[in-house]
Regions:
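Secretory/extracellular carbohydrate-interaction modules
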Residues: 1-69, 75-77
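Short, solvent-exposed beta-strand-to-loop segments that form ligand-recognition rims
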Residues: 139-167
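Short, surface-exposed beta-strand/loop "edge" segments at domain boundaries and coil↔beta transitions
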Residues: 7-13, 30-39, 142-145, 176-189
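Ligand-recognition surfaces built from glycine- and aromatic
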Residues: 156-192
Length: 192
């Protein structure tokens, strides 16, 4: 799978492609309430399990590791101190996007081809007070493109504590190839 987005020591907002499917990931030390999950199309009363990276969980928001071997819990008061850090994780699949799902049926009429999307953007409010908005820069004609909203994570003033505690997010990307037997060409990530 491929992931790219922004990350700090407490939170991550990421785009992800796994098995050819686009989704959005939110990882945080602060879980979302059921009310917020429902607003974002992840109703725990109707969605009894989720599949994240090939593993099934019996909850919409499991507390799991990010998959990054360098993402270590550095809090000496944590029971997971020194081991891989765990985050409350939600994965929003493309069919749950509240913006343009990029499946040809959204406002843009565009069907996603990740190799043709040249830029992705994530806007967020510090301390999580205004949620996050995810964009794709899609082609609309010969030599033309525009930003479209694919999903808005609606969490306005709904958390019991601050998230995004550090305003200094870093660009983070990961290419995780678990089965190399069918790869015939080198795999690359370009950033600018």
């Amino acid at each position: 799978f491929n992931e790219w987005g922004v990350s700090n020591k407490t939170d991550q907002y990421m785009f992800k492609i796994y098995a050819g499917q686009l989704s959005i990931i939110r990882r945080s030390e602060i879980p979302l309430s059921n009310e917020v999950l429902v607003r974002n199309g992840l109703d725990p009363s109707t969605t009894l399990s989720v599949n994240i990276n090939g593993t099934s969980y019996n909850t919409v928001q499991p507390k799991i590791q990010s998959g990054d071997p360098y993402d270590v819990d550095e809090d000496p008061n944590s029971p997971d101190f020194g081991s891989n850090k765990k985050y409350w994780t939600i994965e929003i699949p493309r069919d749950k996007f509240n913006g343009d799902p990029l499946n040809g049926n959204g406002p843009s009429g565009y069907t996603i081809r990740p190799e043709k999307v040249t830029m992705w953007k994530i806007e967020f409010g510090w301390y999580g007070a205004i949620g996050a908005r995810f964009y794709a820069y899609i082609p609309v004609g010969a030599g033309e493109a525009r930003w479209i909203v694919v999903h808005t994570l609606v969490i306005e003033n709904s958390l019991y504590g601050p998230c995004l505690r550090d305003s200094y997010f870093r660009f983070k990307y990961s290419v995780n190839v678990q089965d190399t037997s069918n790869i015939r060409t080198p795999q690359y990530v370009y950033k600018y």
